[in-house]
Amino acid sequence: MSYKIVTLPTYRAVGLSWEGTFSDIDPDLKNVIKQSEDRADELVYKVNPGVQLGLNYHVIENGFAHYAVYEVSEEQELPNGMVEIRVPEWTYVKTTHNKGDNIQQTYMDLHQWLFDSDYTAFKEAGVNYYDPYMPIKHEHYPVNSDPNDPHFDIYIPIVKK
């Protein structure tokens, strides 16, 4: 597995959000992701229409907040029932989870890389996170990704130790 340090500029994303526990992921979160995909045509100013973002923030005990969104330009109006999130410029470690691989193993390998590296996961000031190792996980899914065996890029915000 390869890891790359990248900096992404600030961006705006619009779509649907979900908050819940790990036990609520199936079917609740999967339904929200599907609804976001189904409503993607309402977003006429998508910056990269071929990529759906899964932005995860571990701000709930035994769970997380998830944004199933698309990056959009400032011209995009907020459709009824959708939410907006602005992601600041952050430095990330980027890796790819490949179709057919075990997702849990991909994240375990990433955790080990972080532990061995000169970096640690970034935490926003004043926010209480329930995952001390990777409290923010951004996943970039190609729209043709198989939801039952996906391939996607993982971005973890980081800072120097």
Describe these PLM feature segments.
Residues M1-K161:
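A solvent-exposed interaction/effector surface
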